[in-house]
Amino acid sequence: EEIVDGKSERGSHPVERFPLRQWMLRITSYADRLINELDDLNWSESIKDMQRNWIGRSTGAEVDFFVGWAPPTNPIDENAGGIEAGGQSPPYENWKASRAQAGFPEKPGDDVLRVYTTRPDTLFGATYMVIAPEHSFVEKLTTPEQKEAVDTYVRQSSLKSDLDRTDLAKDKSGVFTGSYAINPINGEKIPVWIADYVLISYGTGAIMAVPAHDERDWEFAVKYDIPIVTVVSPADAEDGTRRREDAKKTGSDEVLSDLVSSREPTEVFSGKGVAVNSGKFDGTPTDEFKAKITDELEAAGLGSEAVNFKLRDWLFSRQRYWGEPFPIWHELDADGNRTGLMRVDSADELPVILPEMEKFKPTGTPEPMLSTAPESWLYKTAEDGTKLKRETNTMPQWAGSCWYYLRFADPKNSDCFLDPEVEKSWLPVDLYVGGAEHAVLHLLYARFWHKVLFDRGHVSTCEPFQKLVNQGMILGEADPETGKAEKMSKSRGNVINPDDVVDAYGADSLRLYEMFM
């Protein structure tokens, strides 16, 4: 699951992204609870902060940028007669008027790129847009002249991991789609680019780029010679409020002149301040401007206040053989194609047992290797005559590791996974001893799993682990020159056999020693 230079960490095999229809668990529905209920736990603040930051709750606004000009030609092609003098065309004006009447829709249409931003106050400084290489609008927005360059770039991006793509130290890259969008706050035409520093998994997979106030956008704009416009001055917010009030009294914009820096800044400013180059909002402090611009966007049907999370829904399927099969069947039509309807195995058909197979290697296609399982396991006919095909994805190891502590309390129960009286007697876990490296994976997933079981009435508490203690981490030999050392791990081949210590001092002594390092 680690990718280095487009190859797997183990074996150095080429890794490529494929679009797959997979199973997801909607952990985002529990995001607020996963944050708020941390306060009641006897865990270190550092671990709590790691989970809070991983979930990454933020407030901001969703904003729609119009791109619905005349696909498949350039959405705003000045040479095709699709744009009037002044940079706008009837379709945009009609769209804007329609939005003013209907309001901001819950889901964006095919004529807009929707973005999420924590800084709607910087909207006047958006000089270009970026969509992720996987965005559904890539084909729609790519002009014939740019198709070859876009196809090449998208292919290259598919070989990179998300970590590589978002590494701040790496050079930014991108490709112009040939198309433009309209900035809804000032009506200006701005180009739409594709760049892999934008991830499809965060927000909407599209951003409004404000290079004067974002480091990544700045680097990209400088590289591709895109305009950079300052819209936030680092002037004192209270000073800005006073000057704005003075300007109102005098009726002159000159009072604000010393707040406005050059439209072409020499460095990035990402903090709070007062608005500049923002029309009637000049001099407005950042927090006040955020609220005002959001209200104005909502009134015009162009945007809305929104909450977003860095946390994504949990990908819960794998294409390998070894894993718990999903107890799900897909209905097939007369031609053997899926209809979209599904059925589940009955209780007396559980658990689903993996078929015996001689070959376990991947198929070389996006299809799970269980798609080559014997037909007797793969297909069946329902009592009503409907032909069914078994789901061939398998569950990840998390399917077992998220709730093992519950089964420990009642391991021999063949009637249910955990007797209610036993659960009330033994749980929640009083003390969990585990490494800090589990903070945003196992510990977060187990909390989510437990909350789902709590909501379903299977456990009596909403949290699984009351107290958490992190033991030390064993390191391998350090480099004598740099002092750097990797953790001791089987995958790194730097382990020491503990048998000698166990023979001399006993296993419990070794365990306690490790716990209190």
Residue ranges and their predicted role:
Residues 120-140, 321-331, 335, 341:
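Structured, non-catalytic alpha/beta "coupling" segments that mediate domain-domain communication
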Residues 7, 62-65, 111-122, 180-184, ...:
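Conserved catalytic micro-motifs used in adenylation/nucleotidyl-transfer and phosphoryl/amide-
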